[in-house]
Amino acid sequence: MKKSMLLVISLLTYCSVFAQSVKFDTLSLDQAFERAKAEGKFVFVDVTASWCGPCQLMLEEVLSRKDVGEFCNKQFICIQMDVDKLEGKDFKKKYGVNSIPTFFILQEDGTVRHRLRGARRPEDFLAWAKRGVNETSSLFFLNNLLEE
């Protein structure tokens, strides 16, 4: 009985912590675009590597926060691109990633809507993500405004 109770408590704790953080789907970029289109969301990409200290810091201190997780999980299909794996290498080349961590908010057609290089404090990261969703403050909108 003790073991069963401990297992249940452990499982509940794990689930509550997991639900609070950014939920990264194990999808290819193309699959993420398809899901984003179907769900009316943008694609959030965390370009990372297992050996990258600032990347791990962002994962542990920012992307694990409840407020960040709730916002990102509601607005985005979230995936990670490991620069040491084939798809990550291709992504890095296609989107001109020259440092990590780098974060992208992409439209369903692959257009960069918003981009962030480097680690940030949680409140700064969340403000960046909110600007990326906002039509008139996204990098995409501002670049188009300059071109007109």
Model-derived features: positions:
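Bacterial Sec-dependent N-terminal signal peptides
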Residues: 1-22
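Short pre-active-site segment immediately N-terminal to redox-active cysteine/selenocysteine motifs
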Residues: 40-43, 47-51, 99
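Non-catalytic, surface beta->alpha helical segment in thiol-disulfide oxidoreductase systems
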Residues: 98-138
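Oxidative protein folding and maturation machinery
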Residues: 141-148
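Thiol-based oxidoreductase modules, predominantly thioredoxin-like and allied folds used
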Residues: 22-27, 65-87, 105
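Conserved redox-active cysteine motifs that mediate thiol-disulfide chemistry
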Residues: 47-63
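A short beta-strand-turn-helix
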Residues: 25-42, 72
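Loop/turn elements at helix/coil->beta-strand transitions in domains of secreted/extracellular proteins
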Residues: 39-43, 74-77, 107-111
